Each structure stands twice: as C-alpha cells, then as structure tokens.
Amino acid sequence: ALKCQGWVDYCNGNVECCNECVMY
C-alpha cells in the first residue's frame, strides 16, 4: 500500500494527498 511519509493518512491512489508517497 502507499503511505504518506510523515502522515497518518494513506494515499488513495492520489499523490496530491501528500508531498511524497512511499511503498509501505
């Protein structure tokens, strides 16, 4: 799954939810 780095929220296929998404 993609997890927002430094965020608790998970990326739902959208990178706009965070600056950088990393493979979790």
From Swiss-Prot:
Contains 5 disulfide bonds. Its main location: secreted. One of its GO terms (molecular function) is toxin activity. Keywords: Disulfide bond, Neurotoxin, Secreted, Toxin. GO terms for cellular component: extracellular region. The keyword Kinase does not apply. Disulfide bonds join C4-C18. The keyword Secreted applies. It is found in: Secreted. Expressed by the venom gland. Potent toxin that may paralyze and/or kill insect pests such as H.virescens (lepidoptera), S.exigua (beet armyworm) and M.sexta (tobacco hornworm). Belongs to the neurotoxin 02 (plectoxin) family. 02 (plectoxin) subfamily. This is U1-plectoxin-Pt1e. The lineage of its organism: Eukaryota, Metazoa, Ecdysozoa, Arthropoda, Chelicerata.
